[in-house]
Amino acid sequence: LGIYSDAGTQTCSK
C-alpha cells in the first residue's frame, strides 16, 4: 500500500 519503487520506476498502488 502506498508508493513503492519497482525496477527503478515509481508505482502507486492502493
Curated annotation (Swiss-Prot):
Q: What is its EC number?
A: 3.2.1.22
Q: What organism does the UniProt record list as the source?
A: Capsicum annuum var. annuum (Red pepper)
Asked if the Swiss-Prot or TrEMBL record annotates the protein with the keyword Hydrolase, the reply is yes
Query: Which segments of the protein form a coiled coil according to its record?
Result: none
Q: Which GO terms describe its molecular function?
A: alpha-galactosidase activity
Q: Keyword Phosphoprotein, does the record have it?
A: no
What catalytic activity does the UniProt entry give for this protein? Hydrolysis of terminal, non-reducing alpha-D-galactose residues in alpha-D-galactosides, including galactose oligosaccharides, galactomannans and galactolipids
Q: What is this protein called?
A: Alpha-galactosidase
Q: Which family does it belong to?
A: Belongs to the glycosyl hydrolase 27 family.
Q: Which UniProt keywords apply?
A: Disulfide bond, Glycosidase, Hydrolase
